[in-house]
């Protein structure tokens, strides 16, 4: 949520930045109109209240002097009725303004590239060499099926499309990746480990920006009015909802493993095969709470923490700075990490690392005090995937495959898999 004062005092500047996002400005313009009406009503209400006080004093004086006060009493009644009417309108406008404010996205940071589509995202760097195969490489869904480690068919029978069973060494590979990532982030990168709830309430989904605008993308348990989490970012960020943190306790850095649940509304026909776009997938998340002046340096470090996973797995990747049109609702600046997937002959997103500045903190009321007794300020929140597990498995299967249909295990994972070096075709 944006600062209301920023909207009121810098309306045209904010409007331009939202235009750079490609946003429909209808709601934003409505905010300006309603806020103007609100200020007019406040001025009128204050004037009427002042008038009511004056009339009340005049009535008291007339009564003390034994004079007729009926006309003044009627005047005060009319003024009082008008104040009640204006107060009702003010409450209605405040409710509308709150709803609109919740629907306005974050404004891009000045370093975010201005663009009209994903084609305008800017490549920052690449790492690793894309492998040249001397045989026809298989897609990960075929590799997983042939190796008997991924079962999409029975998952579709048990649940539906966009689900998978991990089996045998496939399940062990995923578990190895989880442990490797959590160990790396907690032991070397300084994150505190968490295992969060997989269901959250509406206040939590609102705090991180999924609600009210993107409810159709979420899975709702109607009987309880709980949502299955789309990412561990939601429960972990809301862990500090309504908190006032101490400055000396910042930054707070958390890493959390969780299952994630997404309806993928609007994704019909896209990535229908394999692990790239599932309704349920596992992910290791990175979340930080920092002082405002530290957030952009923190974003670079957080992005580097996610990159380190790919480097140790020796998977080729690139980093993109996302343009204004591809920034997402909550971010002021965002980097995407894309890993090379041979079956797509392209890089595919495996992590997003974002600085939300105070956008989420305002919605969730997460603040800190610089000194005891000082006025609380909003923290800046950041998060990143460190990494998405399904896409990491897909990248390993495809990049580490051999001509005989087997898949080598990255060296960094072999210790987590009991020394197993290769997944071979069943005999």
Curated annotation (Swiss-Prot):
Sequence positions that bind ATP: 262-264, 349-352
Residues bound to L-serine: 231-233, 285, 385
EC number: 6.1.1.11
Pathway it works in: Aminoacyl-tRNA biosynthesis; selenocysteinyl-tRNA(Sec) biosynthesis; L-seryl-tRNA(Sec) from L-serine and tRNA(Sec): step 1/1
Gene Ontology CC entries for this record: cytoplasm
Pfam families given in the database record: Seryl_tRNA_N, tRNA-synt_2b
Location in or out of the cell: Cytoplasm
Any coiled-coil regions, as ranges: none
A single GO BP: seryl-tRNA aminoacylation
GO molecular function terms listed in the Swiss-Prot or TrEMBL record: ATP binding; catalytic activity, acting on a protein; serine-tRNA ligase activity; transferase activity
Family the entry assigns: Belongs to the class-II aminoacyl-tRNA synthetase family. Type-1 seryl-tRNA synthetase subfamily.
Reported function: Catalyzes the attachment of serine to tRNA(Ser). Is also able to aminoacylate tRNA(Sec) with serine, to form the misacylated tRNA L-seryl-tRNA(Sec), which will be further converted into selenocysteinyl-tRNA(Sec).
Assembly and binders: Homodimer. The tRNA molecule binds across the dimer.
Protein name: Serine--tRNA ligase
Source organism phylogeny: Bacteria, Bacillati, Bacillota, Bacilli, Bacillales
Gene name, Swiss-Prot/TrEMBL: serS
């Amino acid at each position: 949520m944006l600062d209301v004062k920023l909207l009121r005092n810098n309306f045209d500047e904010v409007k331009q930045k939202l235009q750079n996002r490609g946003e429909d400005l209808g709601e934003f313009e409505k905010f300006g109109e309603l806020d103007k009406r609100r200020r007019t009503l406040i001025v009128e209400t204050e004037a009427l209240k002042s008038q009511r006080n004056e009339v009340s004093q005049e009535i008291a004086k007339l009564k003390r002097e034994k004079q007729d006060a009926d006309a003044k009493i009627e005047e005060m009644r009319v003024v009082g009725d008008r104040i009640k009417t204006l107060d009702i309108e003010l409450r209605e406008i405040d409710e509308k303004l709150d709803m609109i404010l919740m629907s306005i996205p974050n404004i891009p940071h000045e370093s975010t590239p201005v663009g009209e589509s994903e084609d305008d995202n800017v490549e920052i760097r690449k790492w690793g060499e894309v492998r040249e195969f001397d045989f026809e490489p298989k897609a990960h869904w075929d590799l997983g099926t042939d190796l008997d480690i991924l079962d999409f068919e029975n998952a579709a029978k048990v649940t539906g499309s966009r689900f998978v069973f991990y089996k045998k060494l496939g399940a062990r590979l995923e578990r190895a990746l989880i442990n490797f990532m959590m160990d790396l982030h907690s032991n070397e990168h300084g994150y505190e480990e968490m295992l969060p709830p997989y269901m959250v309430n509406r206040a939590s989904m609102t705090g991180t920006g999924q609600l009210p605008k993107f409810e159709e993308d979420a899975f709702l348990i109607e009987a309880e009015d709980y949502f299955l989490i789309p990412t561990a970012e939601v429960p972990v960020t809301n862990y500090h909802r309504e908190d006032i943190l101490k400055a000396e306790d910042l930054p707070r850095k958390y890493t959390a493993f969780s299952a994630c649940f997404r309806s993928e509304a609007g994704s019909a026909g896209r990535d229908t095969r394999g692990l790239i776009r599932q309704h349920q997938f596992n992910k290791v998340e990175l979340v930080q709470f920092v002082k405002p002046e530290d957030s952009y340096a923190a974003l670079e470090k957080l992005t580097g923490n996610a990159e380190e996973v790919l480097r140790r797995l020796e998977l080729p990747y690139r980093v993109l700075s996302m343009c204004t049109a591809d920034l997402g609702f909550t971010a002021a600046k965002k980097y995407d990490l894309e890993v090379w997937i041979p079956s797509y002959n392209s890089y595919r997103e495996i992590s997003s690392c974002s600085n939300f500045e105070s956008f989420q903190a305002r919605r969730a009321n997460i603040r800190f005090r610089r000194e005891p007794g000082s006025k609380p300020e909003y923290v800046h929140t950041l998060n990143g995937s460190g990494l998405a597990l399904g896409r990491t498995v897909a990248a390993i299967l495809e990049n580490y495959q051999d001509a005989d249909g087997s898949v080598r295990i990255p060296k960094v994972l072999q210790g987590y898999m009991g020394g197993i070096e290769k997944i071979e075709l069943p005999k």
